[in-house]
Amino acid sequence: MLNDIKNNAQTRMAKSIDALKHTLTSIRTGRATPALLDRVTVNAYGNASTPLNQVASISNADAHSLLVTPFDKGMIKEIEKGLYNAEFTPNTLGTAIRINMPPPTEERRKELVKQVQKEGEGAKIAIRNIRQDANKEIAKLVKDKAISEDEKKRGEDDIQKLTDTNIKDVDKVVADKEKELLSV
């Protein structure tokens, strides 16, 4: 019973960290990575919300630009529209599209660091809420007389250790992203 609660809490905490990492990949650092275009959608064959990576290959042209090569050359105009809508500036090179990523200004980098910290704080809050849910489940087991007070204390301590470990992981992810932002 306690192990199920701990495993469930660990799984949910890991999902919170994964969600944070996914969110942080979409923050532009000035370095070009294909993950920046994960949320770009295009109007392909009548479907207005087709992900870009399903209609084109995305690769790094160099450290500050991406190359989008459509699988169907007739899709170039739609891909350009999708990129413009996502606030990118595409340059068409015949059968491919280049996207330049200018390095952000110092002021913009500081704004991005604040955004990263805010996202990190959101992940920490989610982890603390998961801890609270797990502790409530443990308290319910005591109330139902399924476990003793000693087991409750041990379970709560284990949940707290999980929480501390996962919050350290969030801090590391946030610190790494801040370092990446400020080193451009």
Curated annotation (Swiss-Prot):
Its main location: cytoplasm. Gene3D superfamilies: 3.30.1360.40, Ribosome-recycling factor. It comes from the Bacteria. Disulfide bonds: none annotated. InterPro entries: Ribosome_recyc_fac, Ribosome_recyc_fac_dom, RRF_sf. GO terms for biological process: cytoplasmic translational termination. The keyword Protein biosynthesis applies. It is found in: Cytoplasm. One of its GO terms (cellular component) is cytosol. GO terms for molecular function: ribosomal large subunit binding. Responsible for the release of ribosomes from messenger RNA at the termination of protein biosynthesis. May increase the efficiency of translation by recycling ribosomes from one round of translation to another. This is Ribosome-recycling factor. It comes from Stenotrophomonas maltophilia (strain K279a). The gene is frr.
